[in-house]
């Protein structure tokens, strides 16, 4: 191997994808089209100054990405760049799906064009993303691929922060808990996630934490999760929001959280390593942290075999029973009903 040789890196990446496919594992690529590292030295700016970036009414560069700029996906050449590069990843590297970073910065038309383009190659390719931005965008919100506009996206999913924060607590405050911490009035938000963010007669949308109306056409458009690479991992969030929590309590609440995720009608998403109680030492955003923080401690498999076995059992349960994978909203409304339960309990 030679990390300084581009041809070697390309070859090894292809070999990696091929090996994963042989093992029955599909590969999803995290793509970040919403910003560049800077503007002045970017290839976009050198080729066509200011064309590829959005600007505010007063001529300043807009910063919907929170990284100093935002790209203008609605412009023909930026749209073509996104389309052609996605198709290249599929055709040349055999990528099976794409996770769009800050998808809410991109316009709806471009995202639907990407979906249509990959459908021509392989309709099973899964596309989803973060249905939000990191700041105000210099483009009409109703034309952006925000979570609230997911019903305008064809076959594209979005992360469900409604369910995430109902379980663990709000994004804005690591020390505040949610359903797992026994906080009141989280039931409707959790139920909304369980049905896949569709409209359901047993859910009072006015009591859902963020969304006041359904935002998916199909449960497959909702990604159900409780933590990801951003923010605190689940173990750290539980420690932060529940002072004095014991290890036994932490494990039980961790398993409860993933029970909600893996029995919901959305597409379940689990942060790598959480099946063995991954711990990033309380680092909130570890993208620039060393391996001592981001590594996977495989010794945890020996420390917490019961956690790994429980996760495995949940996955096996989901795969074995179609009731957890209903194909459309009508089937969910027909077959999934919530039972009467006391406050602090959700049963279905």
Identify the meaning behind each predicted range.
Residues 20, 30, 89, 100, ...:
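Conserved, mostly hydrophobic/aromatic
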Residues 287-296:
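Acyl/amide activation-and-transfer machinery of modular secondary-metabolite enzymes
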Residues 73, 99-102, 212-213, 238-252, ...:
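Active-site rim elements
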Residues 31-41, 102-107, 130-134, 269-280, ...:
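Short, solvent-exposed turn/loop segments enriched in Gly/Ser/Thr/Pro and often Arg
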Residues 115-116, 124-272, 276-277, 287, ...:
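Conserved alpha/beta catalytic core and glycan-binding cleft of carbohydrate-active enzymes
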Residues 297, 301-331:
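Catalytic cores of secreted or luminal carbohydrate-active enzymes
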Residues 1-93, 106-122, 126, 137-138:
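Substrate-binding/active-site clefts of carbohydrate-active enzymes
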Residues 17, 86-90, 115, 119, ...:
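Non-transmembrane alpha-helical segments in soluble domains
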């Amino acid at each position: 191997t030679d990390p300084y040789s581009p041809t070697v890196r390309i070859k090894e990446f292809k070999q990696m994808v091929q090996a994963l496919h042989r093992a029955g594992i599909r590969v999803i690529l995290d793509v970040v089209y919403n910003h560049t590292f800077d503007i002045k030295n970017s290839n976009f700016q050198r080729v066509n100054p200011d064309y590829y970036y959005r600007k505010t009414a007063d001529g300043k560069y807009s910063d919907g990405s929170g990284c100093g700029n935002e790209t203008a996906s609605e412009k023909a050449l930026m749209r073509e760049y996104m389309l052609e590069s996605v198709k290249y990843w599929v055709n040349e590297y055999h990528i099976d799906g794409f996770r769009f970073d800050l998808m809410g910065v991109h316009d709806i038309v471009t995202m639907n064009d990407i979906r249509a383009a990959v459908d021509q190659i392989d309709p099973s390719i899964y596309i989803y993303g973060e249905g939000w931005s990191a700041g105000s965008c210099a483009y009409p919100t109703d034309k952006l691929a925000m979570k609230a506009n997911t019903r305008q996206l064809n076959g594209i999913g979005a992360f469900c922060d409604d369910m995430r924060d109902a379980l663990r607590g709000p994004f804005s405050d690591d020390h505040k808990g949610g359903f797992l911490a026994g906080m009141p009035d989280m039931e409707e938000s959790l139920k909304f996630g369980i049905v896949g963010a569709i409209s359901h007669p047993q859910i009072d949308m006015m009591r859902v934490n963020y969304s006041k109306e359904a935002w998916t056409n199909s449960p497959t458009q909702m990604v159900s999760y409780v933590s990801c690479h951003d923010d605190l991992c689940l173990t750290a969030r539980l420690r932060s929001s529940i002072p004095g929590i014991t290890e036994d309590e932490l494990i039980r609440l961790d398993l409860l959280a993933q029970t909600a995720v893996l029995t919901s009608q959305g597409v379940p998403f689990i942060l790598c390593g959480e099946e063995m109680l991954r711990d990033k030492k309380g680092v909130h955003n570890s993208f620039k942290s060393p391996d001592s923080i981001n590594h996977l401690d495989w010794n945890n498999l020996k420390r917490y075999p019961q956690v790994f076995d429980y996760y495995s059992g949940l996955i096996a349960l989901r795969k074995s029973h179609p009731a957890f994978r209903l194909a459309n909203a009508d089937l969910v409304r027909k077959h999934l009903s919530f039972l009467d339960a006391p406050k602090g309990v959700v049963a279905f």
